[in-house]
Amino acid sequence: MNCCANLSNLVIYRALLSDPIVNALRRPKEFFAPELEGLLLVAAEEKGLTGIIPLEYLLSAIVHEQNVFSAVAEKNDGKIGEGLARAAAHDIVIMREFVDDVFNRYKNHPLLGNYTPTVFRPLPGRSKLEKILLHAEGDADGRQAVRILCSYYNDYGYGAMLDNGAFAWNGELEYLSGTKNYSDMTFDKLYGYDYQKEELI
């Protein structure tokens, strides 16, 4: 079974299978190449991806996905149970094969192999992701990668938590919405909270 077909054996990261770009990367012979390139260029500009765009898209999609592993690891300070760790390791081994295949197919691509977007937005902790999925020597079973990814989710979160430095309450819609551009607030800029500042300092 090749790595693209093997992706359908994912247990935790199954939502990746419904991503149109991931599906196009899985079935390169079924998609018109310029159509896929167009989708990837749009994604690169919207997400601020740079470098080998299909690879960067996959790394971003993997850590942005909300699933039981990402939610439990973030909620429990990076600690998960043995059963969940085995399931995550299973998926990581499968994703490694696919990520490696995509890397090799696109690393020398004239358009997508070394792309620079209009506005670059670095993916937090990208070097950890590269270590987990591309440079995994000595971790054939994926267990070390699970520990690193638990730490990643604990440090950075997943989904919207990765993309926003701050959050504000949207009273009309009654939910937290991400704020990408916010001013840095320091104690000397706060007025009327002298008692609270004393307690915190």
Which role fits each region the language model picked out?
Residues 113-176:
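Interdomain "pre-motor" coupling segment immediately N-terminal to P-loop NTPase/helicase cores
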Residues 133-136, 175-199:
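Dynamic helix-loop-helix/coil hinge segments at AAA+ ATPase domain boundaries and subdomain interfaces
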Residues 1-138:
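Intrinsically disordered, low-complexity N-terminal extensions of AAA+/P-loop NTPases
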Residues 19, 141-144, 186:
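Poly-acidic low-complexity segments
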